[in-house]
Curated annotation (Swiss-Prot):
It is found in: Mitochondrion inner membrane. GO terms for molecular function: GTP binding; GTPase activity; ribosome binding. It holds the Pfam family GTP_EFTU. It comes from Thalassiosira pseudonana (Marine diatom). This is Translation factor GUF1 homolog, mitochondrial. Coiled coil: none annotated. GTP binds at residues 98-105, 165-169, 219-222. Keywords: GTP-binding, Hydrolase, Membrane, Mitochondrion, Mitochondrion inner membrane, Nucleotide-binding, Protein biosynthesis. GO terms for biological process: positive regulation of translation; translation. Belongs to the TRAFAC class translation factor GTPase superfamily. Classic translation factor GTPase family. LepA subfamily.
Length: 706
C-alpha cells in the first residue's frame, strides 16, 4: 500500500516538476539576454532587459503568420546604424497630407498594421489619434509620429520609415508646415470618388514650399462612385503633379498598401548625410507628461544627441539636461543616441512647453558656447544658425470664457493652465464682466481650435461654461508720423467709442473655394454679402472650379462655412490664410439690457450693416431672454445713439382677481401698490442673460445683405 501511495504521489507531482524545470530554463534564457539590445524585424516580438531595473526597455515589432520573409534578426550593424559608420541611406521620412475624410488616419493604420509595427490585437481605428475628440470628429488635432521597419520586396533591404502624421485643418497650418519641414517626402492622399478638395491644395502648397517629393495616392478605389482616372487627371491639371505612377489603393480594404511602401522606398529621398557640423534639430511637436515634464519631438538635421548632454533651445534660450532620448514605434522606446536624419523625442525635466516651441531649433549647449566664444562679443550673429521657418503662434480669434457657477472660477483657471502645458498656442488673461462675473479672455488659432478647447474644458474638467461671441484682432491707429500709435484690440469692449482721427485696421484673408461649377453664382453672391473682393475664377474641369476671394476675417469666423455648405449642398470646400490688415469703416455696436451695458454682447460691425445687425440682434435677444416681473428694455447703441430697441413685456399678476366688485378706489389702490413694487423691482432687479443670447451674436455678426 505504501508503494502504491508513493507511486500516486509521484504521478501527481511529475507535471509540476516538469513545469518548474521549464520555467527555470526560460529564466536562464532571459537572464542570458540581459544587456542585449536589438532592432527587430517586421515578424518578431522580442523583449530585451538591461542590467538594472531603472534602464529596462521594451522594443517590439509584432509577429504574424502573414510575413515569413523577415524571420531573421536584424541588428543595428545590419542596418548601418551602429556607433560607427552610421548611414542615412536607408531612412525615409515622410508625411501624409489629405483633405478631411479622405482616409489619412485609416491609411496610417494600415501602414502600421501591414508592417507589423502594431499587432492586430492592439489595433484600433485611428490609432494615431489619441484623443476621443479626434476619433469622434474624424479629424487629427494633435500630430503623432511612428517609426516603421520595412523590408523591401524589390531589393531585400531593410528600411526605417518615419511617419509623421499631421493635423489637416487650416487652423493648424503652421504646425503642418513644421512637420513637413521634418520630412523629405509626402503621400498626397485623394479620395478617388470626391477628387481634389480645398484643403488638399493648401497642404500641397505647403509641401511644395518645403521641396518635398510628393507621391499621389488615389484612395477608396473600391467605392462604387470611384473614378480614379478622372481624379488623376484632375490632380495633374490642378496641382501639376504627374499621376502616371499614382498608387491606387483602398486603406480600408488594404488594397495597394505594399505598393505605397515600395513607392516610399523608391521615390522619397533619404536625409542628407551628416555634415559634421554642430548638433541641430527641428522641433515639430511637444506635449506635457505629468511625470517626465515636456516631451519634445524633433528631427535631427546635423550631429547627434544622447542622454546626459545639455541642450539649448535657440528661440526661447532655455537650457536643459537630457534625461531620455528615444523613438516612437508608435509607443516611446528609449535609445542610446539619435543621429542626423532620425526622428525621435527627448525629455529633460522641462516644466514649460513654451521653452520648446514648435519650429524652434535644438542645439547642444557646449557647442553653442564654443561657437559663441569664437565670435566678436559685439557681433549680433547667431553662434549656430537656426533652422529656417520658425515663427511664434499668433492667436487669430478671441472669445470670453466664463464659468456658469462663480465658484468654478479657480477650477477654470487650473484647467486652462493644464491645457496650456500641451498647447502653447492658447493665450488667456483674466476678464471681468458685470453680467457674468469673473472669467478669462482667451486667444485661439481659429474657430476649430476654439471649439476643441471649449469641448475639452467641459468634457475633461467637468465645467459648465459660457462662451461669448468670437472676435478677431483689430488694430487702431492714432496720429501720424512719429506720433503714430497702434493699439491692439482683441475684444469689442476694448474698442474706443469715438473713432475720429483714428484708423481701424482689420485682418483680411485670401480664401480659395473649390466647388462644382453649377454653384458659382451662389458662392459669388455669398462673397458679396460678406464684403468679399473677387480675385479669380479658374475652371479646373468643365464641371469644377476654384473661386478666390479676399474677405475680412471677421466675416469668415461667424457662419461662413455653414452658409457655403448650405448653398452648395455640401459639395464645396474652402481654405484660407491671413494676408494683411486693411482699413475698414467699422463701429462698435453696444447692447444695453435694462439700461445697463452688457459688454459680452458688444460686437464690431461695418457701418453699413450696423442698423440691420442692431435690429436683428435686439429682436433675437427679446425672444431669448426670459420675461421678468418688470419691463425690460433692450437697446442697440453706437456711442450714445440708440439705433434699435425693443422691450420684453413683464409678467403680470392680476391683483384685482380678489375684487369681485365694490369700490373703484380699492382697485386703484391695489394697482398703484403693484406699480410701486414693479418700479422698485426694476431699479433693483437683475436680468439673467442665458447662454443662447450670447451665441445669437455669433449668427448676427455679419453683413446686412445676408
Amino acid at each position: 500500500m505504501k508503494f502504491i501511495h508513493l507511486a500516486m504521489t509521484l504521478a501527481y507531482s511529475l507535471p509540476h516538476i516538469v513545469d518548474a524545470f521549464s520555467t527555470l530554463s526560460h529564466q536562464r534564457i532571459r537572464t542570458s539576454n540581459v544587456g542585449v539590445s536589438s532592432i527587430f524585424t517586421n515578424s518578431q516580438r522580442i523583449t530585451t532587459f538591461s542590467a538594472t531595473p531603472t534602464t529596462r526597455r521594451t522594443t517590439s515589432l509584432f509577429s504574424t503568420t502573414e510575413n515569413k520573409k523577415s524571420s531573421e534578426l536584424v541588428s543595428n550593424q545590419d542596418l548601418g546604424l551602429g556607433t560607427s559608420g552610421f548611414s542615412t541611406s536607408r531612412i525615409r521620412n515622410f508625411s501624409i497630407i489629405a483633405h478631411i475624410d479622405h482616409g489619412k488616419s485609416t491609411l496610417a493604420d494600415r501602414l502600421l498594421e501591414s508592417t507589423q509595427t502594431v499587432a492586430a490585437r492592439d489595433m484600433a481605428a485611428q490609432l494615431l489619434d489619441n484623443m476621443d475628440l479626434e476619433r469622434e470628429r474624424g479629424i487629427t488635432i494633435k500630430l503623432q509620429a511612428a517609426r516603421v521597419l520595412y523590408k523591401s520586396e524589390v531589393d531585400g533591404e531593410m528600411y526605417i520609415l518615419n511617419l509623421i502624421d499631421t493635423p489637416g485643418h487650416v487652423d493648424f497650418s503652421y504646425e503642418v508646415s513644421r512637420s513637413l519641414a521634418a520630412c523629405e517626402g509626402a503621400l498626397l492622399v485623394v479620395d478617388a470618388s470626391q477628387g481634389v478638395e480645398a484643403q488638399t491644395l493648401a497642404n500641397v502648397y505647403l509641401a511644395l514650399e518645403n521641396n518635398l517629393e510628393i507621391i499621389p495616392v488615389l484612395n477608396k478605389i473600391d467605392l462604387p462612385a470611384a473614378d480614379p482616372d478622372r481624379v488623376a487627371e484632375e490632380i495633374e491639371e490642378t496641382i501639376g503633379i504627374d499621376c502616371s505612377d499614382a498608387v491606387r489603393a483602398s486603406a480600408k480594404s488594404g488594397i495597394g498598401i505594399n505598393d505605397i511602401l515600395e513607392s516610399i522606398v523608391k521615390n522619397v529621398p533619404p536625409p542628407q548625410p551628416d555634415t559634421g557640423g554642430p548638433f541641430r534639430a527641428l522641433i515639430f511637436d511637444s506635449l506635457f507628461d505629468p511625470y517626465r515634464g515636456v516631451i519634445v519631438f524633433f528631427r535631427v538635421v546635423d550631429g547627434a544627441v544622447k542622454k546626459g548632454q545639455k541642450v539649448r533651445f535657440l528661440a526661447s534660450k532655455a537650457e536643459h539636461d537630457v534625461t531620455e532620448v528615444g523613438i516612437m514605434q508608435p509607443n516611446q522606446v528609449q535609445v542610446d543616441c539619435l543621429r542626423a536624419g532620425e526622428v525621435g523625442y527627448l525629455c529633460g525635466s522641462i516644466k514649460d512647453v513654451l521653452d520648446a516651441r514648435v519650429g524652434d531649433t535644438i542645439t547642444l549647449s557646449s557647442e553653442y558656447k564654443a561657437a559663441a566664444a569664437k565670435l566678436d562679443p559685439k557681433s549680433e550673429e547667431d553662434p549656430i544658425t537656426p533652422l529656417p521657418g520658425y515663427s511664434e503662434s499668433i492667436p487669430m480669434v478671441y472669445c470670453g470664457i466664463f464659468p456658469v457657477d462663480a465658484d468654478q472660477y479657480e477650477n477654470l483657471r487650473d484647467a486652462l493652465g493644464k491645457l496650456r502645458l500641451n498647447d502653447a498656442a492658447i493665450s488667456y488673461e483674466p476678464e471681468t464682466s458685470g453680467a457674468m462675473g469673473f472669467g478669462f479672455r482667451c486667444g485661439f488659432l481659429g474657430l476649430l481650435h476654439m471649439d476643441v478647447i471649449r469641448e475639452r474644458l467641459e468634457r475633461e474638467f467637468d465645467l459648465d461654461l459660457i462662451v461669448t461671441a468670437p472676435s478677431v484682432v483689430y488694430r487702431v491707429e492714432k496720429g501720424e508720423g512719429d506720433s503714430k500709435t497702434v493699439e491692439i484690440v482683441d475684444a469689442p469692449s476694448k474698442m474706443p467709442e469715438i473713432l475720429r482721427e483714428m484708423k481701424v485696421m482689420e485682418p483680411y484673408v485670401r480664401m480659395e473655394i473649390l466647388t462644382p461649377s453649377e454653384y458659382n453664382g451662389q458662392i459669388i453672391e455669398l462673397g458679396q454679402e460678406r464684403r468679399g473682393i473677387l480675385k479669380d475664377i479658374n475652371y479646373l474641369t468643365p464641371t469644377r472650379s476654384t473661386i478666390v476671394y479676399e474677405v475680412p476675417l471677421a466675416e469668415v469666423i461667424t457662419d461662413f462655412f455653414d452658409q457655403l455648405k448650405s448653398r452648395t449642398q455640401g459639395y464645396a470646400s474652402m481654405e484660407y490664410q491671413l494676408i494683411e490688415y486693411r482699413e475698414g469703416d467699422l463701429v462698435r455696436l453696444d447692447v444695453k439690457i435694462n439700461y445697463e451695458d452688457a459688454p459680452p454682447l458688444a460686437t464690431i460691425v461695418h457701418v453699413d450693416a450696423a442698423q440691420t445687425v442692431g435690429r436683428r440682434l435686439v429682436a433675437s435677444l427679446k425672444e431669448l431672454i426670459p420675461r421678468q416681473m418688470f419691463k425690460v428694455p433692450i437697446q442697440a447703441c453706437i456711442g450714445v445713439k440708440v439705433i434699435a430697441s425693443a422691450s420684453i413685456s413683464p409678467m403680470r399678476k392680476d391683483v384685482l382677481a380678489k375684487c369681485y366688485g365694490g369700490d373703484l378706489s380699492r382697485k386703484k389702490k391695489l394697482l398703484q401698490k403693484q406699480a410701486k413694487g414693479k418700479k422698485r423691482m426694476k431699479a433693483m432687479g437683475k436680468v439673467n442673460v442665458p447662454q443662447e443670447a450670447f451665441m445669437a451674436v455669433i449668427k448676427l455678426n455679419k453683413s446686412a445683405g445676408d
